[in-house]
Amino acid sequence: EKAIELDPNYADAHKNLGILLRQKRLLSKIEQAKKSEIKKSYKSNLRLTSNPFISNRKVEAELISQLYKINSKKLDDVDPGYLRYGNGKSSDYELFENNFSTIKTVEKDLINIMKKTVKSDIFIMESFFNIFQTGSGIISHNHIVNFDVTHGLLDQKFSLTYYLDIGDQSCDEPGVLKLQDPDREILPSEGMIVIFPASRNHSATYGGKKDRVMIGVNFYSLI
């Protein structure tokens, strides 16, 4: 908070404070859920009806155009030398804080899908979009952080990808979602939704000539 007082534009301070506040809200909601319902003993690979869980949602024509209007960074500037790379851009991790009507509709629909998939109320920690262009990608990674380990939340955290535009798949690197442990390759289709444990490593490489657009969400089940 001190850093923000000294420099209101200090982006990292804003970002870190936002993360801490969301983590605090998450723990509070989990505690409330424990009090209102006896916590069942699930394992993450049993909580999902399948791992990965695959569904579909029709993509609104105006959704993609709205994403292009939202502030974003070049992929090489988002995770310098670490995660995403190449041509393209990505939003911050608060996509669903935008008030575009279509984005709010998408948020509502995805929340319903997530709740049904993990059989629990959920809490969204991060929401974002990626626009991949020729020669872009994301290296193998997962979405587990120290906070999850410290608070025993590994089995309650999940990741979602929602493919809005699959781009150009007539190339050597069509943007296949590569999951590990166990290995599985998924060629996205328009409107495809994939949900899997956040601990599962995954990657993608894209070489098409047309933009490949997706929304990502990292979320927790409350029970």
Question: Where do the model's predicted regions map?
Answer:
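Catalytic core of non-heme Fe(II) oxygenases with the double-stranded beta-helix
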Residues: 119-206, 211-214, 218-222
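Non-heme Fe(II)/2-oxoglutarate
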Residues: 30-120, 137
